[in-house]
Amino acid sequence: MMQSQQIPTTFQRYETKYMLSPIMARKLRKSLPGHLQMDEYGLDTICSLYYDTPDHQLIRRSLEKPVYKEKLRLRSYGPAKETSPIYVELKKKYEGIVYKRRERMILSEAVPYLAGKSEPGFDSQILHEITWFRNYYRGLAPAMYIAYDRIACFGTEDRNFRVTFDTNIRWRTDNLCPDGPTEGTRLLEPGWYLMEVKTPGAVPLWFSKILDDLAIYPASFSKYGFAYQIENQKESEEKEKAFIPFTDIRQTVSKTAFR
């Protein structure tokens, strides 16, 4: 078998999330010049297709906030096409540290691979891990599509210190095709940002001071988790509307039976 391309395939770092209102985002933006530099991709659209079991075992477990949790997704930078590169990514979190293991494939190779219908034309340790995950969780299938616009930055003094700003986050549970449109239901109000701070170690003191001065605090937030809760609540409400209590049925029968 040919070997996988030599690209970054593993990440191990701390990731902290912050929810920024439009006002907070404007104030923070004024404090960052000279400290952060936008990376070579600038503003990009990130598209992720999350896989889960039929009973949503992975996201339900994740929402319970266990010590260890994991997710599987297909990720593309920009709208995916049949022959465009895409990442098959296994994301794990253990005691606050995020581990990402991913392999690059083309879309037409990745989708049948995750469906268990074929194997890619290369071999690697990471691929073995993803394959084990795919086989362990029976019935894995696309569960939710999430896209958002991201501004990615890195520290001018330390390129390993990264900060991303995600906005226009949208999601859907229909048309779960990686190469489909990037439209969906908005997850946040217009102007809001999800900021993620990613670092292999401690956050720089200058950044901590800026957050303290602006009263910006960490937030527990998962795009897939939050969207799943919204979808789950919507389904519950629809079921309640469709359910007619027995007392209502009895009253209806008593009023119409002898007409």
Where on the chain are the PLM-derived regions?
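Phosphate-end processing signature that detects enzymes handling 5′-triphosphorylated RNA
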Residues: 1-259
